[in-house]
């Protein structure tokens, strides 16, 4: 197994996932790589302190196949769902996205060059009860851990938890509470690479104290510095809780999952309902400016692009 880690913080101000332009850096964001080699093939995990990858994904898949002989089914790309990082679906950020592909491919090469073994691969799980779900939905508290050990010392700890991150600022680049968790784990386990992946947590969020709304209102009233300080304090608290939970799992009984590596990838086709009628689409289109066109994130009318596209299909006779 081999590991690598590199900074992927943007130099220029870019549109972040939260819709704001980044205004400096509070904490660097990183990409991390774990390569497992069973002697006949490799499995590559890449995690990154971003909400998504998009632009870099097809580039990486092609390069690992053609230059490294690794099938895309063996390239596992995992985001932390970080909101305070450049979003990849805005055209102004595409150059950054191409740079990400180059940076991450280099880290994959670095991890392969650093392979050592034999290693033991183990799996464990536990719970992190400091999250909640919107409404009355059930909450998935599970934390999963994949630990790679070499010569009785962990060299990589890949863990996941299903939640949006708690960010450390409003308008600065930071890695949120998962970033602080990884920092704490790496400090507690010498020479380990901590890797976090967001699990299925689109409806789940960190649980906040009962007086959180009062504290945030007071901090906003006091100004940006006070508000950011409150956000950072809470993100660090949640990061500590996550790190403690992962450490408990790592120190508990783990299941040996070593052996030959198998991996597959499949595109699943889902049936679609018939589109709404042209008349219904025209009525919907009356609710927003007629000349808005097709717009990208974070434009407020981006969510209505589908109506204009459907009308174009009707105009060209492509709706069936």
Indicate where each model-derived feature is located:
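Non-catalytic substrate/cofactor recognition surfaces at enzyme active-site rims
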Residues: 1-320
């Amino acid at each position: 197994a081999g590991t690598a880690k590199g900074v992927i913080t943007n130099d220029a101000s870019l549109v972040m996932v939260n819709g704001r332009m980044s205004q400096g850096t509070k904490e660097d964001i990183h990409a991390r790589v774990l390569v497992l080699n069973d002697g006949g093939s490799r499995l590559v995990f890449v995690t990154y302190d971003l909400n998504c990858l998009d632009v870099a994904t097809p580039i990486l898949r092609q390069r690992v196949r053609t230059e490294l002989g690794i099938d895309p089914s063996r390239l596992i790309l995992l985001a932390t769902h970080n909101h305070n990082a450049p979003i990849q679906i805005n055209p102004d950020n595409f150059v950054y996205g191409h740079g990400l592909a180059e940076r991450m491919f280099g880290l994959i090469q670095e991890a392969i060059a650093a392979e050592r073994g034999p290693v033991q691969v183990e799996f464990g799980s536990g719970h992190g009860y400091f999250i909640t779900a919107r409404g009355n939905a059930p909450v998935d508290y599970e934390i999963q851990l994949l630990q790679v050990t070499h010569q009785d010392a962990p060299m990589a700890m890949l863990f996941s938890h299903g939640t949006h991150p708690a960010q450390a600022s409003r308008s600065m680049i930071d890695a949120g509470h998962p970033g602080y968790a990884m920092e704490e784990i790496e400090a507690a386990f010498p020479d380990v690479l901590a890797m976090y992946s967001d699990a299925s947590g689109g409806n789940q969020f960190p649980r906040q104290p009962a007086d959180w709304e009062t504290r945030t209102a007071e901090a906003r009233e006091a100004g940006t510095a006070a508000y950011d300080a409150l956000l950072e304090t809470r993100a660090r608290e949640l990061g500590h809780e996550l790190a403690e939970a992962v450490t408990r799992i790592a120190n508990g009984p783990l299941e040996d999952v070593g052996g030959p590596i198998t991996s597959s990838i499949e595109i699943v086709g889902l049936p679609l309902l018939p589109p709404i009628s042209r008349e219904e689409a025209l009525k919907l289109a009356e609710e927003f400016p007629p000349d808005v066109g097709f717009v990208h994130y974070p434009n407020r009318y981006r969510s209505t692009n589908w109506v204009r596209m459907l009308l174009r299909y009707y105009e060209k006779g492509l709706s069936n």
